[in-house]
Regions:
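Extracellular calcium-associated, cysteine-rich motifs in secreted modular proteins
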Residues: 1-29, 195-212
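Acidic/polar, compositionally biased interaction segments
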Residues: 24-204
Length: 212
């Protein structure tokens, strides 16, 4: 279906919503979800070294923040969104996943300054992830928790989760946070929103075009 503004809403969808089909329309509470099928690996490290990961994904969709689950065996996944905190100060994040996963947060709203803040990997002794049906197990491994990250209220940051699923069911990815002075809780969905590819990275490989 036609999608000239690359916001993952077809022209038919935009007509129903009454939005401009030629201007990117942010969808609050959603990630952009890129999927690569037939990726026969078990770790994100292997996925990131695969040529397939830097090519076209099998599919790109929008997915609600609380619905990242039940994806197919032997598949790689990248979830991206802009995140806008409501308070300035130190934030902490937790990552829960059935399989190998990484949480990256950028210092701005582009992928060029992203940093790895939490992860699950067999290479860290975490097996293939939390390995449970529950999506809210935050303290199984120390590597699930980030350090304190200084963020500014109202500023957009790119958040990216990369996950590799081997085989088996009950796949899931979820995030929690502790805002300044607050307790840990699931990250509110309305702080996330879909995002376009940066103008300087239209091939979507997280490298500025000027570097290539």
């Amino acid at each position: 279906l036609a999608d000239p503004d690359s916001d993952l809403l077809s022209n038919a969808d935009e007509s129903r919503l009454g939005t401009d089909p030629f201007a990117f329309n942010l969808q609050t509470g959603h990630f952009v979800h890129d999927t690569w099928n037939r990726i026969y690996h078990y770790t994100v490290e292997d996925l990131r070294q695969s040529d397939d990961f830097y090519g076209e994904p099998t599919k790109s969709t929008m997915i609600a923040v609380d619905q990242v689950k039940d994806y197919s065996s032997y598949s790689g996944h990248r979830l991206r969104a802009h995140f806008t905190p409501t308070a300035s100060g130190p934030h902490r994040f937790w990552l829960s996943a059935r399989t190998s996963a990484q949480l990256w947060i950028s210092e701005d709203d582009t992928p060029f300054r992203k940093r790895l803040h939490a992860q699950l990997s067999p290479n860290l002794g975490t097996g293939h992830g939390v390995q449970y049906r529950s999506r809210n197990l935050w303290d199984v491994f120390a590597s699930q928790r980030s350090g304190e990250i200084e963020l500014q209220a109202g500023r957009k940051y790119l958040v990216e989760v990369i996950a590799q699923h081997g085989h088996g069911g009950f796949s899931h990815v979820s995030l929690a946070w502790a805002p300044p002075g607050g307790e840990r809780e699931p990250v509110p969905a309305d702080l996330f929103g879909t995002l376009p590819n940066p103008a300087d990275d239209q091939d979507d490989d997280s490298l500025p075009a000027s570097w290539e």
